């Protein structure tokens, strides 16, 4: 017994002091001899019931593997006593958070592997405590973003695996650092290689991935990717498309297009404010008033074929309260840009010059030599409003973005042709029979005929208050010969002309109307219809009642007479049966009424079809 105890004591004394009682009970420890003769201890803990890292890890451990456990978090400075630790592997645990001090004291750490956990965030600043770290494996976690400041903590890495996370994009600072790798710290003739794992992430393919796509195309020769066939997950139109097939544009801040700074509109009319901007991605457009009042209109958004984003603010029936500055804003993630458009609401001018002759129906002279006239030999032509006197163009006029257009008058010859000879007779007379078919106090519908027009022929409708020089233009889509003009003033006389776009309207292509005449006529017609229907009802109703009463009275009399006949016993004269030529007895041809029927058990009606019985003539009479 004493000998056995002595042997055990000797064995205990001979055991290395580093391993004496240091290996945790839930782990396994092993000692390896390295090539240089040094010893390296490896500790492996894979108990599924382990919830925290063990506290009694040997301080000479160089490799620590805590895998497939129930560890959810790592306390701060949990590994600080392990000053010789070079590899820290924590794969396939339940880690959901890491302490920013978890790497404190690990100056020799070269590998940090955390795949298969539940990390939604990573303490990037903790990498400062591990200056020799070269490998960081964060595969199969729940990272949704990498902050821009993380780029300066990842400069020394040669292997970074961010695959199978929830990354949609990477910060520009990180991509730039990868694209400009320095080679000074590497031996001459050796180029640094950085291995990146970015596959299996839901990438949002927009301009922010422009530089990353170029990296995959071999733009940075010092980079190597675990998987180069990255694919888009959004937007839906690009889902599943490989990066190699993308044609992305560089991001660009919003830039507003210069436009009109001030717009004038008549009181009660419709004002249209337009604003356009370019940017990558396309900017979001919005309107607001400079004085903070709410907008009294509708906003429409559209994107033109060249990628310009347009926003249109329509203000119907403007009043003086709508006057003021309107701010158009274009915004994307790179910034915002604004412009101010002023709206001035003016009173509609009234005509003060009148004359009884047809030649002075409509005349007004504007500033700067602009004028408009309407008579038997003058027609209106519209050109964009300019400060100098307007002159006739030799080619088709270019449509202006302004709504208000001025009129220029010119003389027509006896044949009704245009004096400038710009359009042929067939083109000038293409529009015929301009009529007003519908009218309200604020709108009017015009129709016309254009039998020679083609499907591509576009028409323009010009209208203005009768006596004013300022006209508005409505562009009609090709193929249509009807248009409705809205935003008119009630009880106001207007003139409207229809012509082929780019041509001068002729006198017979214009029509003068008032916004109250047709409405009043329609109201009168409706009143006449109501009166006619009322008179018809008054006349027809008594006649209908009279006919019904007469029919009911006749019915009642018939029923009363029938009852009286059956209840009263009367004597009747009997009709004598006549003889036919064939020897048969027949009833006489006289009609037998209800009063002539005989009251008896055997009615004479039974024998009205009388006949021969037993070969003898039978004459029967009943009383």
Swiss-Prot record:
Domain spans labelled Fibronectin type-III: 430-518
Membrane-spanning parts: 527-547
Glycan attachment sites: 156, 296, 455
Subcellular location: Endoplasmic reticulum membrane; Cell projection, Dendrite
SUPFAM superfamilies in alphabetical order: Fibronectin type III, Immunoglobulin, L domain-like
All residue ranges annotated as the LRRCT domain in the record: 201-253
Name of this protein: Leucine-rich repeat, immunoglobulin-like domain and transmembrane domain-containing protein 1
Organism listed in the record: Homo sapiens (Human)
Taxonomic lineage from the root: Eukaryota, Metazoa, Chordata, Craniata, Vertebrata
Name of the gene this protein is made from: LRIT1
């Amino acid at each position: 017994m004493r000998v056995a105890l002595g042997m055990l004591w000797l064995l205990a004394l001979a055991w290395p002091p580093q391993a004496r009682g240091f290996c945790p009970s839930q782990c396994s420890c092993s000692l390896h001899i390295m090539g240089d003769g040094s010893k390296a201890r490896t500790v492996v803990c894979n108990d599924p019931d382990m919830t925290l890292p063990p506290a009694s890890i040997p301080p000479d451990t160089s490799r620590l593997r805590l895998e497939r456990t129930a560890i959810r978090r790592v306390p701060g400075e949990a590994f600080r006593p392990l000053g010789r630790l070079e590899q820290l592997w924590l794969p396939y645990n339940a880690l959901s958070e890491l302490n920013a001090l978890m790497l404190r004291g690990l100056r020799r750490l070269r590998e940090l592997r955390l795949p298969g956990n539940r990390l939604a965030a990573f303490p990037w600043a903790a990498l400062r405590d591990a200056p020799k770290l070269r490998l960081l494996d964060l595969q199969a976690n729940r990272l949704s973003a990498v902050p821009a400041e993380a780029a300066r903590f990842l400069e020394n890495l040669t292997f970074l695996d961010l695959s199978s996370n929830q990354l949609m994009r990477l910060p520009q600072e990180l991509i730039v650092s990868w694209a400009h790798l320095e080679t000074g710290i590497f031996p001459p003739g050796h180029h640094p290689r950085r291995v990146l794992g970015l596959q299996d992430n839901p990438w949002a393919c927009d301009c922010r991935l422009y530089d990353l796509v170029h990296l995959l195309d071999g733009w940075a020769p010092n980079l190597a990717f675990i998987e180069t066939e990255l694919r888009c997950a959004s937007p839906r139109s690009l889902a599943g498309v490989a990066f190699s097939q993308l044609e992305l544009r560089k991001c660009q801040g919003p830039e507003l297009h210069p436009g009109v700074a001030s717009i004038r509109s008549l009181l009660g009319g419709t004002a249209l404010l337009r604003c356009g901007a370019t940017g990558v991605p396309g900017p979001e457009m919005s309107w607001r008033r400079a004085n903070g009042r709410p907008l009294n209109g509708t906003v429409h958004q559209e994107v033109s074929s060249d990628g310009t984003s347009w926003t249109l603010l329509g203000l119907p029936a403007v009043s003086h309260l709508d006057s003021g500055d309107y701010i158009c804003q274009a915004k994307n993630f790179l910034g915002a840009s604004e412009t101010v458009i002023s709206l001035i609401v003016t009173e509609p001018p009234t005509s003060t010059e009148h004359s009884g002759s047809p030649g002075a129906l409509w005349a007004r002279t504007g500033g700067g030599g602009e004028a408009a006239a309407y008579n038997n030999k003058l027609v209106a032509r519209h050109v964009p409003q300019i400060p100098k006197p307007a002159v006739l163009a030799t080619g088709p006029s270019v449509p202006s973005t302004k709504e208000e257009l001025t009129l220029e008058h010119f003389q027509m010859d006896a044949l009704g042709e245009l004096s400038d000879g710009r359009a042929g007779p067939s083109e000038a007379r293409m529009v015929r029979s301009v009529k007003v078919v519908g009218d309200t106090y604020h709108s009017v519908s015009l129709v016309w005929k254009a039998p020679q027009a083609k499907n591509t022929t576009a028409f323009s409708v010009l209208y203005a208050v009768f006596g004013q020089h300022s006209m508005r233009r409505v562009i009609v889509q090709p193929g249509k010969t009807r248009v409705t003009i809205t935003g008119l003033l009630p009880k106001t006389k207007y003139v409207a002309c229809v012509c082929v776009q780019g041509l001068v309207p002729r006198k017979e292509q214009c029509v003068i109307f008032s916004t109250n005449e047709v409405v009043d006529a329609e109201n009168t017609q409706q009143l006449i219809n109501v009166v006619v229907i009322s008179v018809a009802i008054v006349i027809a109703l008594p006649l209908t009642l009279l006919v019904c009463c007469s029919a009911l009275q006749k019915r009642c009399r018939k029923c009363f007479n029938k009852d009286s006949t059956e209840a009263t016993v009367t004597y009747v004269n009997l009709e004598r049966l006549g003889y036919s030529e064939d020897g048969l007895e027949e009833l006489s041809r006289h009609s037998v009424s209800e009063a002539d029927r005989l009251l008896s058990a055997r009615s004479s009606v039974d024998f009205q079809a009388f006949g021969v019985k037993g070969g003898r003539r039978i004459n029967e009479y009943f009383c």
